[in-house]
Amino acid sequence: MGDVVETEDFKITFVSAGEYKSDNEYITPKKGYEYWKFKFKFENTSDTDQNVSTMMDWECYADNSKADQQWIGDDSGLDATLSAGRQTEGTVYFEVPKDSKHIELEYDINYWQDNKIVFVGK
């Protein structure tokens, strides 16, 4: 946590990661799983508008197995079209096995190319 990565268009700060427990009784992980919350800050360092997506740009792996992304509905997503110099902060959530030893989150820098940043949550 606290890592900063600079891409062609963004300065990305990995703010935090950890288990997430909802106060809503209807938002619960399936048996043997828990929710993980990853918080990021994105700053547009380019000269043009750039999009950030909560649901489209991320993949999570727990012990090298793909984890399901979850929509918690707390209005803290990263979705934004950022003008040059603007920033946003938000979270993405995934459902991972409770006994996971390693949790990694991949951010797809460019949909058309195979460029990814890997953030280690655990």
Language-model features: where?
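Conserved functional micro-motifs across diverse proteins
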Residues: M1-K122
